[in-house]
UniProtKB/Swiss-Prot annotation:
2-[(2R,5Z)-2-carboxy-4-methylthiazol-5(2H)-ylidene]ethyl phosphate binds at residues 134-136, 165, 185-186. 4-amino-2-methyl-5-(diphosphooxymethyl)pyrimidine binds at residues 37-41, 69, 108, 137. Disulfide bonds: none annotated. It comes from Clostridium botulinum (strain Kyoto / Type A2). The keyword Magnesium applies. Condenses 4-methyl-5-(beta-hydroxyethyl)thiazole monophosphate (THZ-P) and 2-methyl-4-amino-5-hydroxymethyl pyrimidine pyrophosphate (HMP-PP) to form thiamine monophosphate (TMP). Mg(2+) binds at residues 70, 89. This is Thiamine-phosphate synthase. Belongs to the thiamine-phosphate synthase family. Pathway: Cofactor biosynthesis; thiamine diphosphate biosynthesis; thiamine phosphate from 4-amino-2-methyl-5-diphosphomethylpyrimidine and 4-methyl-5-(2-phosphoethyl)-thiazole: step 1/1. The gene is thiE. Binds 1 Mg(2+) ion per subunit. The lineage of its organism: Bacteria, Bacillati, Bacillota, Clostridia, Eubacteriales. GO terms for molecular function: magnesium ion binding; thiamine-phosphate diphosphorylase activity. Its cofactor is Mg(2+). The keyword Transferase applies.
């Protein structure tokens, strides 16, 4: 499956401001988002399922891949395109056994060692970060900057997206590393005009 990782949106319902998540995701896709990850923390399984199913109606309509953060059961239940796993989540090999070879599995990495391990274990793509300081990541030691991103990117051969503090003022510097895409939350979701916010993060608009 050929995936376009150029503009990777991660959902966060804290930014809804009374708006409908389905509408936000649709506007983001119309603005240029190429892949959507549904991430829900501290909610029941049923609520996560309902949110993911709702988002999938939109991504299916626009033929955009939908990735589920961490929860393989939710990914299976809605027949998502794949899952994204952190370093402390289920091991990639086990996830692959459960989901099969046709599903996308992405892994979060913060250094070359983690990146090579994920690649060797069969990850389809990597989420590399944290690139810049961000409100959602309080661990300053985890910030790797453009230099850290470049080192990791140069060590691997699979697609990757950069994450962490990326916005319309710095995304071009990130893309100069040759990375396949950028992953954002607030740079799109915290804006009033979702479609425009997404469009402002496209290099070839």
């Amino acid at each position: 499956m050929e995936i376009n990782y150029e503009l990777y949106l991660i959902t966060d319902r804290r930014f809804l401001k009374g708006r409908q998540l389905k509408k936000i995701v649709e506007d983001a896709i119309l603005g240029g988002v190429t892949i959507v990850q549904v991430r829900e923390k501290d909610v029941s399984t049923r609520e996560f399922y309902n949110v993911a199913k709702e988002v999938k109606e939109v991504t299916d309509y626009y033929k955009v891949p939908i990735i589920i953060n961490d929860r393989l059961d939710i990914a299976q239940a809605i027949d998502a395109s794949g899952v994204h796993l952190g370093q402390k989540d289920m091991h990639l090999n086990i996830a692959r056994e459960i989901l099969g070879k046709d599903k996308i599995i992405g892994i979060s990495v913060g250094n070359v060692k983690e990146a090579l391990e994920a690649q060797n274990n069969g990850a389809d793509y990597l989420g590399i970060g944290t690139i810049f300081p961000t409100g959602s990541k309080k661990d300053v030691d985890a910030i790797i900057g453009i230099d850290g991103l470049s080192k990791i990117k140069d060590s691997i051969s699979i697609p990757s997206v950069a994450i962490g503090g990326i916005n319309k003022t710095n995304f071009k510097d990130v893309l100069k590393t040759g990375i396949e895409g950028i992953s954002v939350i607030s740079a799109i979701l915290d804006e009033d005009d979702i479609k425009l916010a997404a469009n402002n993060l496209l290099i070839n608009k």
